[in-house]
Amino acid sequence: MESLLHASSSLVSLRPRIDGRDSFINPSRVCLNPSLGRRGSKPLPLVAAAKKKKSKKDDNHNFSARPDEATGPFPESILLKEKKIDEEGDLLPEFADAEEKELYQFLDLQLQSDLNEERMRHYEVVYLIHEKHAEEVESINQKVQDYLKEKKGKVWRFSDWGMRRLAYKIQKAENAHYILMNFEIEAKYLNEFKGLLDSDERVIRHLVMKRDEAITEDCPPPPEFHSVRAGDEYYDDDEEEEIEEDEDEGEGEDEEDADNIEYEVDDDGNVVMVLYGDEEEGEEEEDGASEQEEGQDKSTNGRRETRRTVNVGG
């Protein structure tokens, strides 16, 4: 009996103390050492709950609106606002006022100029369309502009001078449709652009010139060649046609005449034109002596020499 009382008192003295601060621990879950219990009882694990530490960071989240925060439904003016797109299909930014827009355009132009300074070049082209393809002028112009747009080029000026009379016939055409255009494109595409005009049989002539800057002002067509020549009292339209017909025949004769003319400088500093001609047959015998004296100055082909003094720069 005394042994039982002694054992019960020892168990009571070993119960854990639970004060008010740790009152959240459940005493029923605290198990004692099995060596202090009855003999033959199963060992029980000791389980204790840990105290959670509170975060010292303050939570400033608040559902109330700040003074500078907009409230209410989303403005329909922003949802339904029409967006503007430029010529190249890019979305234009929104500007607060005209001054901000002007500043943006200036900075964008300066940036593009710096980036494309070494790649982009300005050119001017004049091309003539055959008169029998007068109805296809618009399609030809569209073809050229589409090519420039494909190569990221830009057209600065486009002038349609219409049908004009040619100074001379080209591919049996007396008139042609004139087009003047200033454009900007990378230098590596210039030969390809010229090939585009060369491959089109409707374009009978074209001329491409390099420019230092973009030209945008309108350029009126110059007066026609025949209207200018009409004021010349010595101008004859029929005579010009005859000259054009005999132009090919006269080219060979001019070349032969040029071969028979030479220029020399005499002792006095005068320029002497020496004209060589074929030696005539049937010359008189009385001139034989003079011919022998002049024979020293003749060329080996037996041509006659005629000298004439020509004033140069006088």
Curated annotation (Swiss-Prot):
A GO cellular-component term linked to this record: chloroplast
Annotated region described as Disordered, given as residue ranges: 49-73, 214-314
A Gene Ontology molecular function term of the record: structural constituent of ribosome
One Pfam family this sequence matches: Ribosomal_S6
Biased amino acid composition, Acidic residues: 233-269, 277-294
Keyword Transit peptide (UniProt): yes
Tissue: Expressed ubiquitously in roots, leaves, stems, flower buds, flowers and siliques.
Comp. bias intervals (Basic and acidic residues): 56-69, 295-308
InterPro entries in the record: Ribosomal_bS6, Ribosomal_bS6_sf, Ribosomal_S6_plastid/chlpt, Transl_elong_EF1B/ribsomal_bS6
Transit peptide: 1-47
Subcellular location, record wording: Plastid, Chloroplast; Plastid
Family: Belongs to the bacterial ribosomal protein bS6 family.
Name this protein carries in UniProt: Protein REGULATOR OF FATTY ACID COMPOSITION 3, chloroplastic
Organism: Arabidopsis thaliana
